[in-house]
Amino acid sequence: MKKYVLLLSILFISVAFSQESVEDLKRLLEEYKKKIQEIERRLEELEKAKKEEEKKKEAVALKPTPADRTLKIRTKYEERLGAYQVSPFSQKAFLPDISLILDFSFVGRNKKDSELKELEIPALYHGHGGHEHGELNEKRGFNLNYAELFLYAPVDPYFDLYATIPFSEDGSTVEEAYAVTRGLPYGFQVKVGKFRSSFGRLNSQHPHVWEFANPPLVYKVFLGEGLIEKGVQVNWLAPVPFYLLLGAEVLQGENEMSFGTEGFSVNEDLRVPDTPKPNLYVGFLKTSFDVGNLSLLGGISYAYGRTRINHLEDEEEPHAFAGRTKIYGLDLTAKYFIDSYRYLAFQGEYLYRRQEGTKYTPESTSPLTKKQGGLYAQVVWKFDRRWRTGIQYNLINKNELKVNGIKKDLPDDLSAYYWMLEFNPTEFSRIRLQLGQNRAFYKEDKRKTINEFIFQFNFVIGAHTSHPF
């Protein structure tokens, strides 16, 4: 009997203890559940804050800091310099960044190639007949515009070296090859070699950076392929709370459209000598500041040099010009960032050229003065991460020519219009459709309207430095 009582007591105590343990376990589980929920809530808050911070960083990263291409921050150099300091004999520290840029297009135009070569703009652009100038998108049908090799590397702690070598079906040339100083005191920087002048806004940019497939009309008639000259540039970044850059260049001055250095023989009794060299002097001022999501970049430029232009070999109206040329430039760029990848951008420039000198023909010489000016203005809208569209307006609004003090009656309503739609699969590829009409060209005093469409492809491989704002 006592055994049964003992067993029942033990069973009762066990059941009571089990019930109490279950209750304790339930309480513990409830407490852990609350703690887990609190941890999950805090993790969600941290994740949300992290995403917002990443969005802010992405917006800042996608909003370029206004900077001139001659004053880019070269973070890669610091990495290589560190490697150099660790091992002075490391070849890796000196290996250059190498990239290749391919530009290919298909062109449809209402003028045959032979007709296009005969067209000219009175007092501004000379028809080149059968001569090949190798212009972009020059021929109807397919064009291999260029395959551009770009190289960059630090030379040592004091200099960086850049080179741009475009290849075409006609051969290759050294477009740019220059060295830039690093770390000069008081905000100074020096560039020596052959380079694109910092005159204006568009001149310093390579064609693959342009928003449109063709150069603006005023650039085409004043500067041709651009001011790409041998010489030296000195610029100074002012120690002020906003971006202010002043610069000066001394250049060889071989540009064929507005300057030139080679003399010419008019006849057996008259020869015009070469210009002194260097022949071209450029000054510029650039400034920039931000107002909220709006970034503004403006500049003024000036170029002065002697001029030698020789068309004495032409079959029709052979002539030449020797004198002096001044070009004034005013540019403005504005970019409004809608969000991290959408923006609306405006870019425009006005150029004014004044030439004074002597016009030579085989029969006579005459004093000649030209006063000419024009502009381009463009708006580009990036409406999606990969898509952009834009329009460009070109106008030559002043075309004054005086020979022997007599003003010539020349057209001064020379215009061109372009529209483009662009798809960028990645930052290394671009597909662009461009439609345009050019009403600036003439033949035998009759205006010849050029209608065209361009289907352009641009591809980049390898390391390539960032482009300016």
Swiss-Prot record:
Identify the InterPro entries for this entry.
Answer: Porin_dom_sf
User: Which key words tag this protein in UniProt?
Assistant: Coiled coil
Q: Which domain of life is it from?
A: Bacteria
Q: Which positions are tagged coiled coil?
A: 11-65
Q: Does the keyword Coiled coil apply?
A: yes
Tell me what this protein is called. Uncharacterized protein aq_2168
